[in-house]
Amino acid sequence: MKAVVLTLAVLFLTGSQARHFWQQDEPQSPWDRVKDLATVYVDAVKDGGRDYVAQFEASALGKQLNLKLLDNWDSLSGTVAKLREQIGPVTQEFWDNLEKETEALRQEMSKDLEEVKQKVQPYLDEFQKKWHEEVELYRQKVAPLGTELREGARQKLQELQEKLTPLGEELRDRARTHVDALRAHLAPYSDQLRERLATRLQALKEGGSASLAEYHAKASEHLSALSEKAKPALEDLRQGLLPVLESFKVSLLAAVDEAAKKLNTQ
């Protein structure tokens, strides 16, 4: 069932993205897509759970226990929906603040990475070119041996392996040479990028200590607000479950007593 729900959810989300494309609307943010997926999944589970409850109450055991689960199901679903509505805005604000606080650092790092990429790209292209040349040379040397294998007999297999071994070692050694050369070319840029990152983080730590402390306080405040808003809804959910559990307990004890009486009379 979960696989079907997730499949429908994916179709729903991709369909919503296609609608934005054709109507030229603003695309959904990742957070909105996650919320849509969670909503579809929760609604599907809720509807499926209600069907299972209805089937159970219609069964012989359900009629005998008389739990009246279906009467409480809609109120529980409403409580869960209320909890989701209360938590949603607080969580959204928390992630928006996190993204806003790290925007400058992400932009600076993207700029540094793009600069390093432009500098090392020629070395990467040269390495790829040489590697393709080595592979092609190896293929040309091995191709006659493959033909010899197809045309020859099994007794020449050992001889063929002996011929392949030095060629493989030669390719490995030549590739190692190219890799070492590439590593030597890239080392200064790697060190430079690491130093820039350390500088950015140090500047953020020293110059933005006040903003970081403020953000920490805001994050704590948001989490505290989230906890406070969730408490009433969770309490409502607990109160909604109590009648169901109590009814189940009473009905189960009654069924056990009735079964014991029947056994005693037999």
Swiss-Prot record:
Location in the cell: Secreted
Sequence repeat coordinates: 67-88, 89-110, 111-121, 122-143, 144-165, 166-187, 188-209, 210-231, 232-242, 243-266
One GO MF term attached to the UniProt entry: cholesterol transfer activity
Domain of life from the UniProt record: Eukaryota
Residues in the signal sequence: 1-18
Sequence positions bearing Methionine sulfoxide: 109
Main location: secreted
One annotated GO biological process: cholesterol metabolic process
Coiled coil: none
Positions of region (10 X approximate tandem repeats): 67-266
UniProt-listed InterPro entries: ApoA_E, Apolipoprotein_A1/A4/E
Family statement drawn from the similarity comment of this UniProt entry: Belongs to the apolipoprotein A1/A4/E family.
Role of this protein: Participates in the reverse transport of cholesterol from tissues to the liver for excretion by promoting cholesterol efflux from tissues and by acting as a cofactor for the lecithin cholesterol acyltransferase (LCAT). As part of the SPAP complex, activates spermatozoa motility.
Protein name, entry field: Apolipoprotein A-I
